[in-house]
């Protein structure tokens, strides 16, 4: 197999990535039937942006393989495969307005309000392992009883990322970026994605 990443955010992707992991899992389960593939991904989401770009790459490859009948498997096995690649890969199988519960269930909602979002990605990232190691108290799960209101503006504005204070205390430059964005007149709210 050959895996190629192109696009402005392709430079920092190593040989071990979600696509290579997925291919290895599919081969180990003999789902590819010794077929070889050239896979080309145009990377449109920055690496380590906390937006699940790598997970969605893998999910798109799975969707393609299933749609083209390259792999044949059960829904149960497909769910297991996505979990082996990454916990949020399953969201990419049908990603619009989807909430992944902490108890492995998925809820989907239709006709949710759309927002204009500005994404700011500094030229550095944080180690997820390091950031989580500094958490002293975990918040209670917020998505175990999801409903459509979770996609409303007021609900989203009240939400927070528990990891954000840890990251902001570590990176002074990021505090300045957040402060600047908060001061903009038409900015409704700012939020860090993922673990920084």
What are these regions (language model features)?
Residues 37-49, 190:
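Short pre-catalytic strand/loop immediately N-terminal to key active-site residues, enriched for Gly-Thr
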Residues 92-94, 98-189:
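Conserved, helical-rich catalytic subdomain that frames metal- and/or nucleotide-binding sites
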Residues 30-38, 64-85:
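Phosphate-handling active-site elements
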Residues 1-35, 133, 153, 161:
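N-terminal beta-alpha supersecondary unit
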Residues 49-78, 91:
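DPxDG-like acidic metal-binding loop motif
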Residues 52-54, 192-196:
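Glycine-rich beta-strand-to-loop/alpha-helix junction loops that act as flexible
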